Regions:
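Cell-envelope and extracellular/periplasmic
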Residues: 1-217
C-alpha cells in the first residue's frame, strides 16, 4: 500500500518527538520505542527521492527538523500494529506556509509539479523492484495559510486537485482513498471555510473521501 502525504507545515511535520515520551502520549510506551528505533518499522518505507528506504525517525521521516515528526509516524505505527504482512510505502510533498494554490494542477504550480514528478519516480522504482501496489491513498494536510478563504474558493481548488489526481492515474483505482485532515477548531489557523469545504467534499463521496480532525490535548 502506498500513501502520499501532501500539504504545508503540518504535513512536513512539526510535532516534537520528545512529546512521544511525555503525557498523554507516554501512556502508550510503544510510541517512544518506535521513535528511538528500539521497535523498528520493518515493513514501512519512505521515499527519499531515489529509492524507498526503511523509515527511521529523525533520519528520513522528513519532519521540519530532526527533532520533529508528522503524520507519517502515526500511519507507520498503525501499519505495524494492525497488519501482519505487506509493506507500507510513504511519500511526502509538503512545504511550510504555502497556499493550496501552490498545488494547482493547471497550470501546474510548483508543489503540484514536484509532487507529481516524485510520485512518478517512486512508481518507476517500485515497478523495477517488482512491487505491485494493492492500493494508493492520499492524505491532504493543508489549509492554515488559507484560513480566511471562503468555502467556495477553497472547495473549487481542492476538487480540482482531486480530479487531476484521478484523471492522471494517481488515484484512479477504485480502492484509492483520500483523507482530508481538519485543523482542530481551537487552533489559531483554523478556517471555517476551509473546514466546510473539506466536509462537503467528503460528504459528497464518502466511499472515496473522508475528513478527519486533528486531536487536541
Amino acid at each position: 500500500v502506498q500513501i502520499a502525504i501532501w500539504g504545508q507545515s503540518n504535513a512536513v511535520g512539526t510535532a516534537l518527538r520528545a512529546e512521544l515520551a511525555a503525557a498523554p502520549l507516554s501512556a502508550d510506551p510503544d510510541l517512544a520505542d518506535y521513535d528511538a528505533n528500539t521497535l523498528t518499522f520493518d515493513r514501512v518505507r519512505m521515499w527519499n527521492g531515489s529509492a524507498y528506504v526503511q523509515l527511521v525517525m529523525g533520519s528520513n521521516n522528513y519532519g521540519s527538523a530532526a527533532d520533529k515528526f508528522g503524520v507519517e509516524f502515526g500511519l507507520a505505527v498503525r501499519w505495524m500494529r494492525e497488519t501482519t504482512e505487506g509493506t507500507l510505502y510513504l511519500i511526502k510533498q509538503a512545504s511550510g506556509g504555502v497556499s493550496i494554490t501552490s498545488f494547482d494542477p493547471a497550470p501546474a504550480a510548483l508543489n503540484w509539479s514536484n509532487g507529481n514528478y516524485e510520485w512518478g519516480e517512486a512508481a518507476t522504482w517500485l515497478a523495477g523492484q517488482g512491487v505491485t501496489l494493492a492500493a494508493r491513498h492520499w492524505v491532504w494536510i493543508q489549509g492554515e495559510s488559507d484560513e480566511a478563504q471562503t468555502q467556495a474558493w477553497y472547495q473549487d481548488r481542492l476538487q480540482e486537485i482531486l480530479d487531476a489526481l484521478h484523471s492522471g492515474g494517481r488515484m484512479a483505482d477504485p480502492a484509492s482513498r483520500a483523507v482530508l485532515s481538519q485543523m482542530h477548531p481551537s487552533t489559531s489557523t483554523y478556517g471555517a471555510g476551509v473546514a466546510a469545504a473539506k466536509t462537503a467534499i467528503a460528504g459528497a463521496t464518502p466511499s472515496r473521501f473522508s475528513d478527519i480532525q486533528f486531536p487536541g490535548y
